[in-house]
UniProtKB/Swiss-Prot annotation:
Sequence motif: Cell attachment site, positions: 234-236
Entries under Gene3D superfamilies matching the protein: 2.60.120.970, Cystine-knot cytokines
Protein name: Transforming growth factor beta-1 proprotein
Post-translational modification note: Transforming growth factor beta-1 proprotein: The precursor proprotein is cleaved in the Golgi apparatus to form Transforming growth factor beta-1 (TGF-beta-1) and Latency-associated peptide (LAP) chains, which remain non-covalently linked, rendering TGF-beta-1 inactive.
Main function: Transforming growth factor beta-1 proprotein: Precursor of the Latency-associated peptide (LAP) and Transforming growth factor beta-1 (TGF-beta-1) chains, which constitute the regulatory and active subunit of TGF-beta-1, respectively. Transforming growth factor beta-1: Multifunctional protein that regulates the growth and differentiation of various cell types and is involved in various processes, such as normal development, immune function, microglia function and responses to neurodegeneration. Activation into mature form follows different steps: following cleavage of the proprotein in the Golgi apparatus, Latency-associated peptide (LAP) and Transforming growth factor beta-1 (TGF-beta-1) chains remain non-covalently linked rendering TGF-beta-1 inactive during storage in extracellular matrix.
Molecular function terms, GO-annotated: cytokine activity; growth factor activity; transforming growth factor beta receptor binding
Higher taxonomy: Eukaryota, Metazoa, Chordata, Craniata, Vertebrata
Entry keyword annotation includes Glycoprotein: yes
Organism of this sequence: Xenopus laevis (African clawed frog)
Cysteine-cysteine disulfides: 277-286, 285-348, 314-379, 318-381
Keyword Transport: no
C-alpha cells in the first residue's frame, strides 16, 4: 500500500513538472533572432545562386542594360499580381483552419447521359445536413473514373454548374481539362470548392454538374470518352454495371462544428490590427518584420536591385489544445520521455513564401534571377 502511494505521488509530481514546462517559455533574445535570420539569408542567397563566395564587384559603378531593368520590373509585376490573386482566393483564416483536423464526406452522384453531356446530380440538402455552414467547408472535389480507350486523340472536356434560378436553368463554366489517351483506367478530378460553397448558401434540394466536350464537331471519335457509372457513348450498356467504388462522387472535407469556436476565437485575436501581430512582444504566432539592407547588413555591393527587401520571420506561441486532465497528457508524457529533445507543441513556421527577383553582377555581366521562398508573408502552427 505504501509503495502504491509513493508511485501516485511521483506520478503527480511528474505531471506537475510537465504542466510547468508547457506553460512557461524562455525569454526570446530578439537581437539574437535577428542576427541568425540575417546569416541564414546570407547563406540562402549564395546557395540559390550556386556561388562559393560573394562576387567582388560594386554594382553602383555599373550601367545596367535597359533589357535587364525591364525584365526585373516585369518579374516584380508578376509576383505582385500572383500575391493579390492568392490573397483574394484564400481567406485570412485559412491558415488557422488548415491546422485542425477535417471530417471527410463522400456523396455519390446520380448520373445521366444526355446528348454527349455527362450529368452529375447531387442531393444538396443531404450535403448541407452533413457539412453545415459554408464557413465550415474546407475542400470539395468532383471525382470520376475514366475508362481506358483505344482512341488516339486528345479531348478537351469542360465542366459546368447547372443551376436553377427563378425557374430558369443556367450554366456556369467552371473548368476544362485535356483528356489524353491512356492504356489503363484512371481517376479524374475537378476542384469544385467554390461551387459547393455556394450550394451551402442556397436552399435547392438538388444541384448538378455537367461535363461535355469542348469540341462541337460532328466527328464521333472526338466525343468518345467513357466514364464509369454512365452508359457508353457508343450506345452499349456495359458501363451501367459499374462497381460501387468507381461511381462518380463528391468528396468534401470540412471543419467539424465543435471546432468552430476555436477558429472563431483565433479570428478575433488575429483581427485586432497589424500592431498586435507585428509588435515584437506579441504572444501569437505571426509574421515579425525584418528588413535586410544588402550593403549595411550583409556588406554586399554586387546586388544592384533591390537595395534591400522585407525578409521577415515567424515567431510566437502556438495554440496548445490539450488539457492536463485528459488522456492526452499520458500520451504526451510518454512522447516526452522517449524524445526528450523534441517539441511536443506545434511550432510557428513560415506558411506562405514569395520569391525575390534581383539584378546582380558576376564580373561585368548583369543578370536577373528570381530567388524562390525568400519573403515570409504568413506563418502557421505546424
Amino acid at each position: 500500500m505504501e509503495v502504491l502511494w509513493m508511485l501516485l505521488v511521483l506520478l503527480v509530481l511528474h505531471l506537475s513538472s510537465l504542466a510547468m514546462s508547457l506553460s512557461t517559455c524562455k525569454a526570446v533574445d530578439m537581437e539574437e533572432v535577428r542576427k541568425r535570420r540575417i546569416e541564414a539569408i546570407r547563406g540562402q542567397i549564395l546557395s540559390k545562386l550556386k556561388l562559393d563566395k560573394t562576387p567582388d564587384v560594386d554594382s553602383e559603378k555599373m550601367t545596367v542594360p535597359s533589357e535587364a531593368i525591364f525584365l526585373y520590373n516585369s518579374t516584380l509585376e508578376v509576383i505582385r499580381e500572383k500575391a493579390t490573386r492568392e490573397e483574394e482566393h484564400v481567406g485570412h483564416d485559412q491558415n488557422i483552419q488548415d491546422y485542425y483536423a477535417k471530417q471527410v464526406y463522400r456523396f455519390e452522384s446520380i448520373t445521366e447521359l444526355e446528348d454527349h453531356e455527362f450529368k452529375f446530380k447531387f442531393n444538396a440538402s443531404h450535403v448541407r445536413e452533413n457539412v453545415g455552414m459554408n464557413s465550415l467547408l474546407h475542400h470539395a472535389e468532383l471525382r470520376m473514373y475514366k475508362k481506358q480507350t483505344d482512341k488516339n486523340m486528345d479531348q478537351r472536356m469542360e465542366l459546368f454548374w447547372k443551376y436553377q434560378e427563378n425557374g430558369t436553368t443556367h450554366s456556369r463554366y467552371l473548368e476544362s481539362k485535356y483528356i489524353t489517351p491512356v492504356t489503363d483506367d484512371e481517376w479524374m478530378s475537378f476542384d469544385v470548392t467554390k461551387t459547393v460553397n455556394e450550394w451551402l448558401k442556397r436552399a435547392e434540394e438538388n444541384e448538378q454538374f455537367g461535363l461535355q466536350p469542348a469540341c462541337k464537331c460532328p466527328t464521333p471519335q472526338a466525343k468518345d470518352i467513357d466514364i464509369e457509372g454512365f452508359p457508353a457513348l457508343r450506345g452499349d450498356l456495359a458501363s451501367l454495371s459499374s462497381k460501387e467504388n468507381t461511381k462518380p462522387y463528391l468528396m468534401i472535407t470540412s471543419m467539424p462544428a465543435e471546432r468552430i469556436d476555436t477558429v472563431t476565437s483565433s479570428r478575433k485575436k488575429r483581427g485586432v490590427g497589424q500592431e498586435y501581430c507585428f509588435g515584437n512582444n506579441g504572444p501569437n504566432c505571426c509574421v515579425k518584420p525584418l528588413y535586410i539592407n544588402f550593403r549595411k547588413d550583409l556588406g554586399w555591393k554586387w546586388i544592384h536591385e533591390p537595395k534591400g527587401y522585407e525578409a521577415n520571420y515567424c515567431l510566437g506561441n502556438c495554440p496548445y489544445i490539450w488539457s492536463m486532465d485528459t488522456q492526452y497528457s499520458k500520451v504526451l508524457s510518454l512522447y516526452n520521455q522517449n524524445n526528450p529533445g523534441a517539441s511536443i507543441s506545434p511550432c510557428c513556421v513560415p506558411d506562405v513564401l514569395e520569391p525575390l527577383p534581383i539584378i546582380y553582377y558576376v564580373g561585368r555581366t548583369a543578370k536577373v534571377e528570381q530567388l524562390s521562398n525568400m519573403v515570409v508573408r504568413s506563418c502557421n502552427c505546424s
